[in-house]
Amino acid sequence: ILRFCLWFMGISMAFPSLSQTMLVTNGNTSSRIILKENNQISWTAANLLQTFIQKVTSCKLPVVISQTPRKGDILIGGQSPAEVTEDGFSISTQDGILKISGKENGVVYGVVTLLEQYLGIDYWGENEYSLTPSKTVNLPLINKVENPGFRYRQTQCYAIHTDSIYKWWNRLEEPNEVFAAGYWVHTFDKLLPSSIYGKEHPEYYSYFKGKRHPGKASQWCLSNPEVFEIVAQRVDSIFKANPDKHIMSVSQNDGNYTNCTCDACKAIDDYEGALSGSIITFLNKLAARFPDKEFSTLAYLYTMNPPKHVKPMPNVNIMLCDIDCDREVTLTENASGKEFVKAMEGWSKITNNIFVWDYGINFDNYLAPFPNFHILQDNIRLFKKNHATMHFSQIAGSRGGDFAELRAYLVSKLMWNPEVNVDSLMQHFLHGYYGEAAPYLYQYIKIMEGALIGSGQRLWIYDSPVSHKYGMLKPALMRRYNHLFDLAEKAVAAEPDFLKRVQRARLPIQYSELEIARTETEKDLVDINKKLDLFEERVKEFQVPTLNERSNSPVDYCKLYRERYMPQKERSLALGAKVTYLIPPTGKYAALGKNALVDGLFGGATFVDSWIGWEGTDGAFVIDLGETKEIQSVETDFLHQIGAWILFPLKVVYSYAEDGEHYTHWKTIDLLEERTGEVKFRGVKAESAEPIKTRYVKVEVTGTKECPTWHYGVGHPSWFFIDEVIIK
């Protein structure tokens, strides 16, 4: 065998045409792209191949249908080898003919692999790619079969929606391509709208805390047979209207512990030892009614843990979500992760049909550093090991998000092949996308990873730069990061494309500097204004659309920063005053609230700094100015962040007294309900045309106490938060 191999290699080198398929030679070609099937996938593959061969060689290969191939032709489609699975492909060169076949989208991914591995083309981001022009394209002997690590692969990057090639090149899919009629997660209210059934049939919805809770965000009474029949009819009509789809999601609305606890539902869940019991029982009935269809349902928050007895039917897909896990180390290395892993291992014992939704994102601060590159591969390997066949790696993929392009590139590669060399891929991307700046950015990434782990601070999906100001973002490290970015910008100063990419990658450090600065009592106002102006200039230049999941604009942030966080000309008379609570804040906020309401520091969009909260109750406190003073206004600043169940209160009442006992009513202010998803601040102010002499100011707040029917915490305690009381 060895003698034969050496003989064949010698013959191949002496007669290269025996081992090569020649597509273009010295700028000339007679090759054709032949489609075995005249369908959209084949045409997508052909157009992609034609486009990039033309970009490399300036030769445009014709595309023809169902013709007999000859030497030098490219055959797309046809029968795939038996070992090819969903989205997998085969590439072979035989008798001078290049053959690419695949299942589902496989022929497109085969073309991408050919262009990457044999023509040396890299696709980095939105209409951003690298290639080396050549007048000759000769392919070696190829016999390759590749199958994806996951049959469905999804992530987030702005380029998916702005560049028609990007998604194909990264071998990604989107829910609307797979799931019927947009029925993908949190579908209960779409299938059984509370606006239609809630008033007349509250029994269709969750029972807890002594009553039914119909509402847009409520869950179903899964033991109610009428609910099942209505939903089954809806499912039937949806699939009939979408005959090309075979999967849809029947899954709980967003929110936690809003499940039904009626006697029948509770009996199922108690027997199963998990709140997923009733939903899997329901889904199995649906799967049996429609055996040729597939149903995806969430194992999310209260349904994360698997049932003890009932097993999901093969056509029930478990969408398992690790939303509560911290991200500073792998899932097997911290307590929150271990809890999830235990649940995942439990599911993997009873089903092979698992979809893992992994959260590598900071929902509250897309532009904050999120150094989790070191955990990506181990976590994805873990998912695959535990029978995950579908995977959504959710990242901050919006324009300006922390290394959005690199992050999407890496998770896409890992979802296709969990065994790739991640460090090599990272360095390859950095050099290709940032040029000579790459070594400095690589150092920045690695130093921050080490600093995060060394700090012992958690990294989570509602994080804030302020949480890390004594850890990975402490002053000495921030100076080092900025020095590395200075070197990176200098290295590519003469190359505008690379320079802009480096400047965009710097935004998270600039944003972090501003966020940390607003929490400091001593401020270098000249420096802050300079940094704020530059940040605003850059987010406009790079068209950064949003700071967070709630769609708050970075341009609005800059405006708000100047109004809210920069020192005002007139000082509050309440600064440093004594605060006495009549109805104290909840939990840890009682201690934090001793000074926070009168320290002159306004809180940010997250509630990790400066905010004081009350849960499920009203609030009341007295501010002692220390002596009688003349005042004309009092204003209390509130936070609205529905994702954290933080709502504006219903009412604020102000009164005052000179002796601290006999109070005079000043003003009662009723607040309008706010339902927007955006994070908002609202100052509730009482004013007097004439000065009021007083020492004590009482603030009484009537909270919503309970999340309303439209909120996904329906029926559970709501919060209100105050960061500052201003008296002038």
What are the functions of these language-model segments?
Residues 306-313, 320-362:
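Glycoside hydrolase catalytic-domain groove-lining segments
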Residues 296-324, 367-374, 400-408:
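Substrate-binding cleft/loops of secretory-pathway carbohydrate-active enzymes
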Residues 226-229, 338-437, 443:
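Structured mid-domain segments that build the active-site/substrate or prosthetic-cofactor binding neighborhood
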Residues 62-85:
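Short, well-ordered secondary-structure micro-motifs within conserved domains or adaptor modules
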Residues 414-594:
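Catalytic domains of carbohydrate-active enzymes that cleave complex glycans
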Residues 603-665, 680-728:
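Aromatic, loop-rich ligand-recognition surfaces of beta-strand-rich domains
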Residues 29-30, 38-41, 45-48, 52, ...:
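Feature activates predominantly on carbohydrate-active enzymes
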